[in-house]
Amino acid sequence: MPKPNHPSGKGPAKPKAAAAEPVIPENYVDFAEQLMKENCSLITKTKIQNLLRLACDVYNNENRRTEERLLKESVNQIKLLRIRLAYECGRDSQVRQFVESANLFEYLAKLSSVGTCTRQDLIDYYHYMEALVAFHRYYSESKTGEENAS
């Protein structure tokens, strides 16, 4: 008699491997530069700066601390940041495309998981956001300069 839950009927299906936890890459500066080189026009300077500003308060609170785990208050602020990010993505498909290519939702989801994230993870996220803003400025100015020269 075939066993249920397996496509071949030979026993229970094996569980799928869990997806790897999203981690800010060690070479996040190079990653941010490449991303902005290709996707700079997807998001405005104001929108990307606002995303950084939202993360800034959490970063400032956690950067002064020495404990390894995030405060519950910080985790709640990160959840609000995810909500704001979802709102911005819903308003503008280009922002959504940028957020997806930058993996911002995945990183924030990890940060907002109570007990699984460290202060260093938040600091890395903030530095990644700073790199995105800096390279956005660099590449948007480069493109503006090229257009004016033509």
Spans of model-derived segments:
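Small/polar/charged residue-enriched interaction surfaces, especially the RNA/DNA-contacting tracks
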Residues: 1-150
